Amino acid sequence: MMGSAQTLATRHAPNPRGLVMGMGLKTLQKRLSHLTGNAIRDYRMIEEGDRVMVCLSGGKDSYALLDVLLRLQKRAPVRFELVAVNLDQKQPGFPEHVLPEYLASLGVPYRILEADTYSTVERVIPEGKTKCSLCSRLRRGLLYGAAEEMGCSKIALGHHRDDILETFFLNLFYGGRLAAMPPKLRSNNGRHVVIRPLAYVPEPYLERYAERMAFPIIPCTLCGSQPDLKRQMIKAMLREWGEIEPRRLANIFSALQNVQPSHLADKELYDFINLVGSVQPGEDPVSALETPHGDGFPAAEVLSGVQRHDPQSA
């Protein structure tokens, strides 16, 4: 456990939708660097000598992730490498020139992977069904393979705080389980560590930063045609909550870091089965209380004025 809920809540920004609109670029950069740096430090995401593969999709989140990591790299107490990787999934109309030109302008090492996962998803998933799950699995496998080839020890993804909260409520409402996106995890093949350095960053910061930086955003034609996804409904719910009570989302995220298994109901996380008290079966309940308890006086004294009823004498 990393600290009390109150302390944890202060480490993360409250819902900043109104506040962020008035922020200047420098203020936004400092805030993003601060939140990202905290997450990296809290979970030891990046260590000395790491070669970090930054997955770049062409969306606002991954652009911001690369930008912030490049800034942190210049002043970090540890030395690490960054390699940007994009997967060209052969979606119709995908502007293949945008990312290579952008990455070349930054002078950052990069690699463009090419795989026609678009056709696979279109062929396998029926019309009107959600394509995100299969698309994600195919993409993940290709990225793991690329990380292996390039000798990358860490794989950095652009998921932010609100992505994590959305996943939590999706699992809660539709899956019947308490689970979200962890800030750090071992990859499926066990060879790499996947990190989410933007885990503390609320989405409005990234929306505003993308506008101010004029990132060359590339829309996803697979997801953009599915407006009724459950995740989008959850997103709308969280956005409304944030407007009603600005600290609510920060407090929910803090709760994910402050789990108390003994106050839930999962028998695998807490041994409820073997949980017993000190009173033995058949023992006189008042005499059992003669031993001083944590409050410093015999609990039996509290019961001294209570009339005892013996069913045998009734």
Curated annotation (Swiss-Prot):
Pathway note: tRNA modification
Database matches in Gene3D superfamilies: HUPs
Taxonomic superkingdom: Bacteria
Protein's GO biological process: tRNA thio-modification
Pfam short name (any one): ATP_bind_3
A molecular-function term among this protein's GO annotations: magnesium ion binding
Cellular component, GO annotation: cytoplasm
Ion transport keyword on record: no
Keyword tags: 4Fe-4S, ATP-binding, Cytoplasm, Iron, Iron-sulfur, Magnesium, Metal-binding, Nucleotide-binding, RNA-binding, Transferase, tRNA processing, tRNA-binding
Signal peptide per UniProt: none
Predominant place of localization: cytoplasm
Reaction(s) this enzyme catalyzes, per UniProt: cytidine(32) in tRNA + S-sulfanyl-L-cysteinyl-[cysteine desulfurase] + AH2 + ATP = 2-thiocytidine(32) in tRNA + L-cysteinyl-[cysteine desulfurase] + A + AMP + diphosphate + H(+)
Cofactor dependency: Mg(2+); [4Fe-4S] cluster
Assigned EC number: 2.8.1.-
Protein family according to the UniProt entry: Belongs to the TtcA family.
UniProt xrefs under HAMAP family: TtcA
Biological role: Catalyzes the ATP-dependent 2-thiolation of cytidine in position 32 of tRNA, to form 2-thiocytidine (s(2)C32). The sulfur atoms are provided by the cysteine/cysteine desulfurase (IscS) system.
Subunit structure: Homodimer.
Name of protein: tRNA-cytidine(32) 2-sulfurtransferase
Lineage of source species: Bacteria, Pseudomonadati, Pseudomonadota, Gammaproteobacteria, Chromatiales
